[in-house]
């Protein structure tokens, strides 16, 4: 009898239980009741916590980090909108320009190579507003980042990016001219010249010029800007007058009163000449001293002179309207003024140095004589035009200086 009860008990585990009508299934032994409800607790001081200063600062920092991250968004419209919001944010939080200058320029400079023209235009407006607000001591160490992407844009495979690159270079040149020391442009001198070589098409090995640029009556505004920015760059690096002005406007910390107050230790004289510490290069000129001088810049551009002179000649021939056919364009006079400015710079440099080779002088003299003949025709055909009167005045100054330097022999012929 006992065995039958045990057998029934074992089979009961596998039998399907038949429930009576109206009764629910029995709850298991490990059942947990979850039918209870919770109530929220509201503190009377909870609203005051959201208005504290540390929460506002944290929100601003998070918003700024969010904007910087959105600069890499895949959508061009989103990148443009982010730049506009970032502009408004920096205008309302100008301390960002002091505390996060390197980070800001590091993340915005790559947009120079952005495929969207609207993003590049928005970036140009952004840099145009803030590059003159940043302190020179903060801008100069970080301006190389903008130069890096500008050089990449000048040699970019996309024509639209290539055309917009000189807009950013013009901003950098104006910043270096007005607020920074000459070393800022000297460190970028060689690379920028190489980029202009590819952009404008002059050859560094010979006097041949790739006719990739044409400044005729149908010349584009982009190529005119390339030529104008190139002239500004050369003037800033080679013109002695601009260099003297640049040194006056740059930031140099001078303390003349220290010369009267400093007491020199007697053993200091032992370290004024290179001795056992020579391997440390403590007494050698640094990189800025080596490149920040007109001699270095002239030696760098020297191999490019034949190609540049030929480029100047071709640009003048393309833009100069020697025949009055009614198709004169305002862009032609701008090109001619810029060409005369560039030619005057190289005339001053080549003819003021006694040991310059004769072939460079001959090429410049030939270009001057050609321009002198064309100027006579311009005076006859367009002498009453205000735009061309500026060209005629510019040539008169160049002619006077060329005669002083014996660069223009027999100017009447």
Curated annotation (Swiss-Prot):
Gene Ontology terms describing biological process: rRNA processing
Kindly indicate where the leader peptide sits in this chain: none
Q: Which Pfam families match?
A: Ipi1_N (PF12333)
Where is this chain's protein located in or outside the cell? Nucleus
Taking the first listed entry, what is the main subcellular location of this protein, grouped into a coarse class? nucleus
Q: Does the keyword field hold rRNA processing?
A: yes
Please name the SUPFAM superfamilies in this protein's record: ARM repeat
Keyword terms: Nucleus, Ribosome biogenesis, rRNA processing
Question: At the top level of its lineage, which domain of life is listed?
Answer: Eukaryota
Q: One Gene Ontology cellular component annotation?
A: nucleus
The similarity comment for this entry is: Belongs to the IPI1/TEX10 family.
Function, as annotated, reads: Component of the RIX1 complex required for processing of ITS2 sequences from 35S pre-rRNA.
Its subunit composition reads: Component of the RIX1 complex, composed of ipi1, rix1/ipi2 and crb3/ipi3 in a 1:2:2 stoichiometry. The complex interacts (via rix1) with mdn1 (via its hexameric AAA ATPase ring) and the pre-60S ribosome particles.
State the protein's name. Pre-rRNA-processing protein ipi1
User: What organism is listed for this UniProt entry?
Assistant: Schizosaccharomyces pombe (strain 972 / ATCC 24843)
